[in-house]
Amino acid sequence: MKNIMSLDIDFFFTEMNIYQKYMDTELTPKQSWQLIKWKAAKNKEKLHFEPCNLALEYVKNILLSKCKGVKRIALIQEHDEIIKVLEKEGCSEANLYNFDYHEDVSYQENIEEDTELTLENWIQFARKKNLVKRIAWIGQDDSRKVHQTLIKVDSTSWKDYDWWNFPDFDVLVICVSKHFTPPKYWKLAKELKEFAEGVE
């Protein structure tokens, strides 16, 4: 059984709940970020767009010690693209460890509205396709559980789980997540991929 580490770069941004309310995912990511900054300034709200260095160090420790034997490191732009990666890797009932600010199971109250794969429900689709079975979500202290399905997700703040307790990973998927990661840090996904590729 494969162990999958899925890392969404928005995991590192601890003030997501503050600036997320200004977001518009119907716009391009760059337009949405311009709107966020404009609305925040209009409301005289100062936003902090820097990653949490402690969370970054935590993930680097995992990459150094638990990703030495990964058979595949994939870089994707949005999280729903992970489905193709898992299919290509022949995943079946894999253990998924999702490092993400968001839960990504389902945000719809009405299941009929959740019939197409999106970046908000990709875990639900990975389960439907039997790509993953056990799901662990590692988020931030202010991440919120919102999914409306019976899919069991073990969830914790990264601060409550020691990095050395994770298993060795077979597949590492890193997601840029442009709507939720400030543009200045889109390059962080590539940097972490290169960091993981350099691990021996």
Can you say where each PLM-predicted feature lies in the sequence?
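Conserved alpha-helical scaffold segments that buttress catalytic/binding sites
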Residues: 2-200
